[in-house]
Design a protein with these regions (language model features):
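Active-site/ligand-binding-proximal alpha/beta "capping" segment
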Residues: 154-167
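Feature captures the catalytic cores and cofactor-binding loops of soluble hydro-lyases/lyases
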Residues: 2-148, 165-167
Length: 167
């Protein structure tokens, strides 16, 4: 298991908002924070799935350096889309963070890892595996649009979206 480290990020969402208010979108505060890292940012990569995390695994198997995986699970609370094994895969492949419009599981273990994950809640139920979903399309939830190649910034205060890199 990969445990949390003392990592610092050179921004806060509050300061980013104050300095860039006219060009940012702010997600509604619906997410819980999981993992040992609480701040992250990167280029948006999107998935649209429903109760099937096959595409999550496929995406996390590639190099995610400088990228944040946005998983639109249609806000389903019936099963988890990310667990400790996928969190470890994300760490191994250098993903900056994951935002899940749905649930995660293994939260106790994930909270000890050097990973940043935002999700709606937890569920012990695993997802189905049918390899159904869409990759790199605009997804909308939490009152904002997550568009591939744009940028997301997240910390304990919230989630911001920008068309350009700010830090």
């Amino acid at each position: 298991m990969i445990y949390k480290a003392n990592m610092s990020v050179n921004f806060t969402t509050a300061d980013l908002w104050d300095d860039n208010e006219g060009i940012l979108s702010c997600a509604s505060p619906i997410f819980k924070t999981f993992g040992g890292k609480h701040s992250f940012y990167g280029e948006i990569v999107t998935l649209k799935i429903f109760e099937d995390n096959s595409f999550v695994r496929n995406m996390l198997e590639i190099n995610g350096k400088g990228k944040v995986l946005i998983v639109d699970g249609s806000a389903s609370l019936r099963c988890a889309l990310v667990g400790d094994k996928l969190a470890e895969l994300a760490i191994t492949n250098n993903w900056e963070g994951i935002i899940v419009n749905g649930c995660i599981r293994d939260s106790f273990l994930i909270n000890q890892m050097d990973i940043a994950i935002k999700a709606l809640n937890t569920s012990p139920v695993k997802s189905i595996k049918r390899n159904i979903g869409e990759i790199d399309i605009p997804v909308n939830f939490s009152g904002v649009s997550f568009i591939p190649k744009q940028f997301v910034y997240s910390d304990s205060d919230g989630v911001l979206i920008s068309k350009k890199l700010l830090v």
